[in-house]
């Protein structure tokens, strides 16, 4: 675990989640990321890293009823993640969230802003969810964890690097990429088991540090490091939008993947007030 823990961060929010879990009731565990978080449809649900983390909570807090919200979508980065997080994840009011975009984002100012905005949206939720950043990797060891670590440090977040953990083992000849991945980036069941175990090791460590203080003071969210522009993004469903002006456009919801406002009349006009 020592190699995988990029930063322990501030554990106050996680202690709050532990305290809530000890009381019983209902809690929500969330994960948002790309195809690694979603995982292949061929992989059994219980073998996916997010479900392995869910199992940790269920095992350690048997009195509590847990729900997992897996908000992973393949081939998407934190830019789209920041737009959809309210609908796909935060609407369920999660208590603990894993953020995984280190292999989908690029090392650019735009992605730094969207990654930060996504994190700020989660941290600003009324229930003050705990957040952990997870850094996966490609076959060549590349990802954008260095850029994301700067943001994580700014917000004092726990950060877990799958990349650091497996790269050390691979360099020592104790692990081959083919054992954990079927292609250049997507982990197989063994790779997911490693990722889930790394998160769970961190949770074990944090649980031992918890002193059951029922009067925790959650630190205020600091000013943005780069920008707060993506903190206020929102994804609108076309069906729910009411045009302020419409000439020749109709909403077509019949297609599975092509729902939206459509027109076959040249010169048609449609306007929305946002």
Give short role names for the model-derived ranges.
Residues 1-31, 37-44, 55-64, 174, ...:
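N-terminal secretory targeting modules
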Residues 35-38, 103-105:
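A short, flexible beta-alpha/helix-coil linker loop
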Residues 22, 48-71, 76, 80-211, ...:
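Alpha-helical cap/lid subdomain in secreted, periplasmic
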């Amino acid at each position: 675990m020592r190699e995988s823990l990029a930063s322990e961060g501030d554990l106050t929010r996680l202690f709050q989640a532990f305290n809530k879990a000890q009381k019983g009731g209902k809690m929500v565990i969330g994960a948002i990321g790309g195809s690694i978080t979603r995982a292949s449809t061929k992989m059994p649900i219980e073998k996916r890293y997010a479900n392995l983390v869910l199992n940790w909570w269920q095992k350690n807090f048997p009195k509590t009823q847990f729900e997992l919200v897996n908000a992973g979508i393949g081939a998407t980065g934190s830019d789209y993640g920041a737009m959809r997080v309210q609908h796909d994840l935060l609407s369920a009011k999660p208590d603990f969230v894993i953020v995984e975009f280190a292999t989908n984002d690029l090392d650019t100012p735009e992605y730094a802003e969207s990654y930060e905005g996504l994190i700020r949206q989660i941290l600003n939720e009324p229930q003050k969810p705990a957040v952990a950043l997870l850094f996966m990797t490609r076959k060549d060891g590349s990802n954008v964890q260095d850029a994301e670590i700067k943001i994580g440090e700014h917000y004092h977040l726990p950060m877990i690097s799958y990349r650091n953990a497996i790269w050390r083992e691979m360099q020592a000849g104790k692990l081959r990429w083919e054992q954990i991945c079927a292609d250049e980036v997507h982990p197989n069941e063994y790779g997911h088991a490693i990722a889930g175990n790394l998160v769970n090791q961190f949770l074990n460590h944090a649980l031992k540090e918890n002193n059951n203080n029922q009067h925790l003071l959650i630190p205020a969210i600091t000013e943005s490091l780069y920008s707060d522009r993506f903190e206020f993004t929102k994804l609108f469903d076309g069906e729910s939008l009411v045009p302020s002006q419409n000439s020749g456009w109709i909403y077509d919801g019949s297609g599975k993947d092509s729902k939206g406002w459509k027109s076959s009349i040249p010169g048609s006009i449609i306007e929305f007030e946002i």
